[in-house]
Amino acid sequence: MSAKKNKKKKPIVIKTSACRKIKRSDGLKMKWVQEYTFRGFLEAITSRFGNLKAYSIFGDEEDKFISYNRLKWGAENISTYLLEKGFAKGDRVAIVGESCPFWMMMYLGITYVGCVAVPILPDFSQREMEGILKESGAKAVCVNVKHFKKVEKYAYSNNLMVVRMEDLTQIPSIPEGFTFENAPGISLKEHSHNYTLINTSVPSEDDMASLIFTSGTTGSSKGVILTHKNLLVCADESSDTYVKVKKGVRVLSILPMSHCYEFTITHLLCLLQGAEIVFLGKPPATTILMRAFKEVRPHVILTVPLLIEKIYKAAVLPTLRDNPKIAKLYKNPLTKWIVLKTVKTKLISTMGGCIRFFGIGGAPLDETVWDFLYSCHFPYALGYGLTETSPLIAGCGPKHKMHKKGYIGKPVKHDHVILLNKNEDGVGEIAVKGPNVMTGYYNNEELNKEVFTEDGYFKTGDLGYLDKHGYLSIRGRVKTMILGPAGENIYPESIESLINNMEFVQDSLVVPGDGGLVALIKIDLEAMQEKLKISATDVKDEAEKYLVKLKKSVNEQLSTFSKIADTELQEKDFERTPTQKIKRFLYSRKKKEEK
């Protein structure tokens, strides 16, 4: 045989550029899909990746996975079942539960025929869930066993179809002697699909796909209307700005899928490019994460800042601060790079050794942690956006040369970002217009008039700065910005970043008080007790004394108008939204004005 015949064939690789063929009259250029609908999405991913692994769960057996073909097959069966039960385009189906393959299969089955998915964050209370089911007009709810009790009363008393998420089985009722977990029912995913029926209910790009009720830090929850086009344009275009993955890349899914950042970027974007997504399947405790990192060896992780901040405070900061030799090397500009390179290698090894993209979004990243990641060239990437923008507005990839210190990155393609009411420093409210921006808030015309400008820009409520190269820097929230004694703008997030990097500090919140700024500070009392060798009865008094020293140290680093006037020891954990933002509205220290 000739050498030519023995030569191995090169694997076929679908290049991004080869997919960029479809130009549209609206200026968009589709890369991965034929149309921006979830029907088009499923057709695209199965035609290219058919029998490849789409989903698996950490800890499951190797052969227990869902392929791209199986995902589409199950979704079509669900679609058929819904239509046979009288559901029509626009009807709402709620999804409540932790992330798993059947969560996505249910979502795709709902939207494949133009029904609307109502993802509900599993951390919501029973009262909040019942309110969302009522306000959305849901005709069905898919819920896992863990959260069933939160919806049981409302669902059955209002004749909603109830589907058990663990096996996608409708449970019409729970017979005596059974529980929701083992009650008999009718399988949706095994139901025979009917293409003739499915093709009578075809969604369009501008149809509502998701109705998402946000969990705000201000205490109000709003229904965000996102269309098929909103979500899929964001996923399609974000592969240029934010994250590019290849076929077969392993992605570790940690966040709830009802979180728009997780849904659009981890799932839609990565499925469009043939990734294998592995669900953590358990609460992200440190021990579980370490095992998952070691066994899954992910290439891609997307998470909220709290995770990397915890890793930094637990593994990195003590090394840089408490080891005298390393601390000395780190402070010396000539030897700092040696420490950074060593710590970076250790950090990547801790995450399984294969990490190529560590996406951070959903909340502001601590400035000290950000500076460390930037300095050691860790493959992180920041993303900025809101549920209302599907969610990505701006970001950058993990390559160091794409990063600019203090800046999130550039706006995604087709998004136009402007700043409203800029001050003398060029800081203003970020406003955005683009195909990923929501059509509006559900049943709230008054609020829609308030958040959209006359020329169609959505006002984000965030303060930002755009440099001459188009890089966006986030400076804080309009509603959390505090006015100083002479009208100065004070950004509490910057002060909190300084406090959080002090020894023993677990968390902090800076709020306005009647006598100036008040810092509520959560101290790690166990760590303090252990290091100072004091008794449990004395540690609280010691913590109060420590706050006095902390206040002095932090104030030395602040301008006169943003100095802390008082500190309080925060004994309980701060209440947070499911995206780990502190609910600031609960902690005001200003006395109500007397009427």
Name every feature range the model reports, one short phrase each.
Residues 50-53, 183-213, 220, 244-250:
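Conserved pre-ATP/AMP-binding loop-to-beta segment of ANL
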Residues 54-100, 104-108, 125-130, 228:
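Conserved AMP-binding/adenylate-forming core of the ANL superfamily
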Residues 65-69, 209-235:
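Conserved AMP-binding A3 loop
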Residues 122-156, 234-252, 285-299:
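Conserved ATP-dependent adenylate/AMP-binding module captured primarily in the ANL superfamily
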Residues 150-205, 315-346:
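ANL superfamily adenylate-forming
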Residues 232-250, 257-344, 354, 379:
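Conserved AMP-binding/adenylation subdomain of ANL enzymes
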Residues 425-484, 501:
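Conserved ATP-binding/catalytic segment of the ANL
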Residues 482, 507-510, 515, 549-595:
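Conserved C-terminal "lid"/linker of ANL adenylate-forming enzymes
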